Amino acid sequence: MRSRSNSGVRLDSYARLVQQTILCHQNPVTGLLPASYDQKDAWVRDNVYSILAVWGLGLAYRKNADRDEDKAKAYELEQSVVKLMRGLLHCMIRQVDKVESFKYSQSTKDSLHAKYNTKTCATVVGDDQWGHLQLDATSVYLLFLAQMTASGLHIIHSLDEVNFIQNLVFYIEAAYKTADFGIWERGDKTNQGISELNASSVGMAKAALEALDELDLFGVKGGPQSVIHVLADEVQHCQSILNSLLPRASTSKEVDASLLSVISFPAFAVEDSKLVEITKQEIITKLQGRYGCCRFLRDGYKTPKEDPNRLYYEPAELKLFENIECEWPLFWTYFILDGVFSGNAEQVQEYREALEAVLIKGKNGVPLLPELYSVPPDKVDEEYQNPHTVDRVPMGKLPHMWGQSLYILGSLMAEGFLAPGEIDPLNRRFSTVPKPDVVVQVSILAETEEIKAILKDKGINVETIAEVYPIRVQPARILSHIYSSLGCNNRMKLSGRPYRHMGVLGTSKLYDIRKTIFTFTPQFIDQQQFYLALDNKMIVEMLRTDLSYLCSRWRMTGQPTITFPISQTMLDEDGTSLNSSILAALRKMQDGYFGGARIQTGKLSEFLTTSCCTHLSFMDPGPEGKLYSEDYDDNYDELESGDWMDGYNSTSTARCGDEVARYLDHLLAHTAPHPKLAPASQKGGLNRFRAAVQTTCDLMSLVTKAKELHVQNVHMYLPTKLFQASRPSLNLLDSSHPSQEDQVPTVRVEVHLPRDQSGEVDFQALVLQLKETSSLQEQADILYMLYTMKGPDWDTELYEEGSATVRELLTELYGKVGKIRHWGLIRYISGILRKKVEALDEACTDLLSHQKHLTVGLPPEPREKTISAPLPYEALTRLIEEACEGDMNISILTQEIMVYLAMYMRTQPGLFAEMFRLRIGLIIQVMATELAHSLRCSAEEATEGLMNLSPSAMKNLLHHILSGKEFGVERSVRPTDSNVSPAISIHEIGAVGATKTERTGIMQLKSEIKQVEFRRLSISTESQPNGGHSLGADLMSPSFLSPGTSVTPSSGSFPGHHTSKDSRQGQWQRRRRLDGALNRVPIGFYQKVWKVLQKCHGLSVEGFVLPSSTTREMTPGEIKFSVHVESVLNRVPQPEYRQLLVEAILVLTMLADIEIHSIGSIIAVEKIVHIANDLFLQEQKTLGADDIMLAKDPASGICTLLYDSAPSGRFGTMTYLSKAAATYVQEFLPHSICAMQ
């Protein structure tokens, strides 16, 4: 018999430690571990972490086996791990109905439970009796399921279980937009059951998704059916949100020690090494103590000041927990593991020694790791005064199995029994290693032979869609439908993946479906979804964005491949040449660079060997039967004649026997419109409407047609007015100016509706006119009246065979209008159809997840609706319609702006610095205002032009508003002199950092608006011979530009085209209006407000108080505090007035820095502003200013000249605000300071 080696003896000692502290508690039937002797429930997260020591020890025995008994011991340990993992699987699979429901609802009531009965795997508390939604717990289970499977363990035994795991992937893939209760089961730190977005959950979900992607759950014994599929776009959503959250942990926790599990073992979810180090140092600096780390600041758990009889905390109570938070040795085990994986031996040694000092020796000298160390009740005051000086006492579970397990695992690795690669077989530890440069492969395809010839004339040789066969080309929406079959299991009542928008990472791969290669075109060129794809310049911008995104986010094997089809809509109006924007983009891609990305153009067949290709094994024939329903319509050749897919579908009859081809053709046939209207004539309709860029609704045409048809009560059928509050009343019978702004508009037209013999309305007259007219505008007018009077599903019986509902006809008309790029009419029909961005909820989520709250509608509340958490698609669109008061035009424009904001958030996040709330209603308002100012035109002309802008021009205008570069003003923390606000400086700014399109954007806008004005005048003279007038003002009135006030010279009206004035006049007022509308504040503003609240009882803004008690609940760096401050400031409807209030608060922060105890009780900030205004008026009058120069804004009572004053200088706003603040608070200041003032 061989003698036992030293390593074997040491392993035996760890085996005894594992047995005595962990395995002795494992249930022999279920394999689950109870939390402690007193708490018999099994928590999912704790169980996974607690078994890691057993898994590691088993790997160590297998690696260092001296004899057969060691191999047997390794097998025994590994099977204990399998038993626990399968026990947890049984617990969760019993709740399969919740998994199915949660995929669609993301509701806390539909979530998997966080803990189960150790003996039976049953649930132990009700759905609403615990914070069950903890995505990090489900994610850590999936992460280690992947790691353990990769290490050789066989945990999953059947395809039913594979499908369940696939659905768990769908369960966690929305973690980036799902607020949960987090790793500490508390949600918001007030412990009141408020869920929030947690970085620990997002990071762990991201790690689990990456680990499971393309993993065979049967290991080496598996096949295609047991492979898990993950969509790369969902992973990157998590990555993006995680990067934006860190080093913060959530909205209520500015830092949390649980982030150690995200930036290091086990998740390794962060790819930016600098961000990893920043987060790590934040934890060490703010949370580390003598016995471990606090979980987060002001954590009251098991502190002497916590009331054990009460589950929740009062908000102001959190201040009591400051500096006495319990310290957890658990987190030092993470630092040990981090040191091992990073190769930092010094860190490993330091924390091992520190941990040894806080371990408690149990029976027979067994080292036990306590749950936490708490301040003794009699030493609380001493700890308050001198943090980290009082000796603490151990409390809670002993041992804390989670911490005990990681302590043993860290010791095994530190002593060399395990290498990092053995405990991390999927190589997640290399996440921060720089990735190779990405070259995006672009295959340009022509829809038809004619387009191919046009491209060839330009020196661009391409293939047609038909010529790439047997490679098959499909639109992105088809890939979304295909993925909806993934994970489907009828026996378990699992429906598969919910239908969702397909991102660019998903469409940039090739797909192997039943031995046939498929490629999918990007989502943004699908013209059936939203009208952005009808604008060729917008297509180029979206292509540029996607290419840039691919270069920074692509992490898969192989290069990304974009299939870019050139369709008929990308040609000029005559159809003989390529649109200049598209041609320029193609030439740049051929040159090798576009949008900052390296490009390789070529044929699809040339890219087969270098592309990333995924085998969609779930599309193979399986136990679930066929891919499609037997009752679908086999007539799949009815695609629209203008659809770019025609080149591909021409071969469809040759492959009717192919089930996949029939399935895909079925999807195409049911997602494409079928033409039913008569084609537009070239003479009477198309050419005229090409030239006629009119108002969004072209209400005049509607009324004219109503007169011809003798329609009564036309006002009942007109589109709802844009933000009806404070709207002018218009009389359509004459051209008088608007009057009585506060009245709801009415229309009085004395006409008669045709009736049949029985006296009923004869709608057949309308339908007959619809059939005969070739004018697109007239068709829209008639369909709108039918839509409002008969409903969208009314069958017009336009043709004998088949139905022709109003909705179907409007959809077809939308396609026709799109071809002539009539943007006002496009938006109008989109509004009628309630046509929404398919990825609207994703755009909203992108913004929210970057900690930007959204509001829709115009202030004040309750009209302005706040969106502070991700919403399901339908709920989001309902909220937008409600906020827009049913106005379909503004509803559709709000969605459009939301998409553009999300685009800029992904590509230029710096535009949104120090902005926590994006008020889309105000942004639309300020866009119209700025357009009027830039073009020196009236508000009516500007608002009409805004609704007729192309999407690309609208996006450029938004960039102009966000960047503010035209004004040569920016926010800065370094003042140019002592009197300047620390947040504002003036200097010349170039166009560095903007794209060429954005640099020339405003010039294009001016040109486009001038054309709109010319066409509007032409239409008013040609199309309205009866003296009618254009109703541009009816869509977006002056009251929309300045809510609550009329547009007068004192409130921001703009001169006409021929008025000249000093370009500097109005510059600062415009700057303040922009910053106020965008909620932009100086750097560090919210932290300074927190300090001010420490010196007073609160700040009052327009009667709404921000109390000082807020600081007892929230810390300075919390997002929650920033949002709370924003909610008070947003009570002010006028952007420029709001910005003056911000400047006044900045002055108060300077006073708060003085060494005094208090600067007042409740400080009325608006009063300080009005005192400053009075001082300004007095001084201006002494200098000879007259009443006209010193006109006041009627809404706020502030002199417009003060709004337009620079912050610095003798007459600067900061000068007067400083004097006003000193005057207001002087009674609270020491006499010596008052004398200095």
UniProtKB/Swiss-Prot annotation:
The protein's role, per its UniProt record: Phosphorylase b kinase catalyzes the phosphorylation of serine in certain substrates, including troponin I. The alpha chain may bind calmodulin.
InterPro entries (UniProt xref): 6-hairpin_glycosidase_sf, 6hp_glycosidase-like_sf, GH15-like, KPBA/B_C, PHK_A/B_su
Family annotation (PANTHER family): PHOSPHORYLASE B KINASE REGULATORY SUBUNIT, PHOSPHORYLASE B KINASE REGULATORY SUBUNIT ALPHA, SKELETAL MUSCLE ISOFORM
Protein name: Phosphorylase b kinase regulatory subunit alpha, skeletal muscle isoform
Gene Ontology MF: a single term: calmodulin binding
UniProt membrane topology term: Lipid-anchor
Ranges annotated as biased composition (Low complexity): 1042-1056
Regulation: By phosphorylation of various serine residues and by calcium.
